[in-house]
Amino acid sequence: MSHLRMLVMIEEHGQVSAAAAAMNMTQPAASRMLSEMEAIVKSPLCQRASRGVVLTKFGEALALARRARTILLELREASRELNQMKSGSGGSVYIGAVTAPAISLVVPAIRRAMDTYPGIEINVQVESSNVLARELLAARHDFIIGRIPDDFDPGLFSIHEIGIERACLVVREGHPLMRGEPVTLQDLSGYDWVFQPPGALLRRTMEDVFLTHGVAMPRNVINTPSVVLTLALVCNTNAIAPIAQDMAEFVAGQQADMAEPAFCQRISNSWSSLTASLPPKAGSCRPAPACFMIWCWMKAVS
C-alpha cells in the first residue's frame, strides 16, 4: 500500500522529494520505492520535467494514479468500516456539491445522517462542477451534486436528475437600485459586477441574458469563484452579483446587508446527483453514502 501512496503523492506534488516529505520518509527511500514499482511493471512510471517529474504514458496507461486512489480509498474505508462494525456505530461519506444544493440538500441530509449514524464521519467539499467531476473520477468522493460539465463524457457517470438550481441578482441594502424606481437590464450594466470565472455555467447564463436582451455586457467585472468574496464585495460596494437563490435566501436570513434589486432576473439551471460509473461487479455505494444520497434526493423532490 505504501507503494501506491507514493505514486499518488508523486502525481500530486510533481516532485519525488515533496512526495517523500508528505509520507515522512527520506528521498532515497522514496526513489528506491519508485524503482521497485517500475521493476514490477517493467516500465518507467515517471520522467523528468521542467519542474520535477510527471507520470509517463505507461503510468497513465495503467491509470495507476487514479486506480491507486481508488484502491487506497477502498482500503481506508474497509478499515474504518471494520472498526465501526466492532463498535456498532459510524460510517463515512465523502460528498461534493455546488453551493445551492450544499445549503438546501446537504445540510438537511447531514442533520438526518448524524441522527441515523451515530459517529458518522461526513466530509463535504463545496466547489464548481468542473472541479467536483474531476474529484469524483479520482475516487475522492462517493457522489457529487452538481451540473454535468460540458467537457466531460456523461458516460463516465451514473447521473440522476434531482432538481433545478435557481439564481438571482443581489445588491447591498441602500443600493441606488433599491430606491423603488423601475429598473431595466440596461440600468444594471452601468454598475460593477462580480461574476464567476469565464466558462462557469452561471456566468454563461448571465451572458446569455444580456445577449438575449440586446444589452452590452458590463465593462467593470470582477471574476472570482469565491462565494464569500462575492458576498463581501456586494455588501461593501455598489456591485451586482448573480448567486444561487438558496444562498441569497440564507444570507438574507442572517440579516446581512444584502437585497435583491427591483429588477430580478430569475435564472434556472439544472443540477444533478452524480456517481462515478463502476464496473458491474464493483458494487454500489456503501450504506452511509447511499442513504445520504437518498436523503438529498428526497429533500429535492419534497
Curated annotation (Swiss-Prot):
<keyword id="KW-0804">Transcription</keyword>
<protein>
    <recommendedName>
        <fullName>HTH-type transcriptional regulator GbpR</fullName>
    </recommendedName>
</protein>
<dbReference type="InterPro" id="IPR036390">
    <property type="entry name" value="WH_DNA-bd_sf"/>
</dbReference>
<dbReference type="Pfam" id="PF00126">
    <property type="entry name" value="HTH_1"/>
</dbReference>
<comment type="function">
    <text>Activator of the expression of chvE when bound to its inducer and represses its expression in the absence of inducer (L-arabinose, D-fucose or D-galactose). Negatively regulates its own expression.</text>
</comment>
<dbReference type="InterPro" id="IPR005119">
    <property type="entry name" value="LysR_subst-bd"/>
</dbReference>
<dbReference type="InterPro" id="IPR037405">
    <property type="entry name" value="GbpR_PBP2"/>
</dbReference>
<feature type="domain" description="HTH lysR-type">
    <location>
        <begin position="1"/>
        <end position="56"/>
    </location>
</feature>
<comment type="similarity">
    <text>Belongs to the LysR transcriptional regulatory family.</text>
</comment>
<dbReference type="GO" id="GO:0003700">
    <property type="term" value="F:DNA-binding transcription factor activity"/>
</dbReference>
<dbReference type="InterPro" id="IPR036388">
    <property type="entry name" value="WH-like_DNA-bd_sf"/>
</dbReference>
<dbReference type="Pfam" id="PF03466">
    <property type="entry name" value="LysR_substrate"/>
</dbReference>
<keyword id="KW-0805">Transcription regulation</keyword>
<dbReference type="InterPro" id="IPR050950">
    <property type="entry name" value="HTH-type_LysR_regulators"/>
</dbReference>
<keyword id="KW-0010">Activator</keyword>
<keyword id="KW-0678">Repressor</keyword>
<dbReference type="InterPro" id="IPR000847">
    <property type="entry name" value="Tscrpt_reg_HTH_LysR"/>
</dbReference>
<dbReference type="GO" id="GO:0005829">
    <property type="term" value="C:cytosol"/>
</dbReference>
<keyword id="KW-0238">DNA-binding</keyword>
<dbReference type="GO" id="GO:0003677">
    <property type="term" value="F:DNA binding"/>
</dbReference>
<feature type="DNA-binding region" description="H-T-H motif">
    <location>
        <begin position="16"/>
        <end position="35"/>
    </location>
</feature>
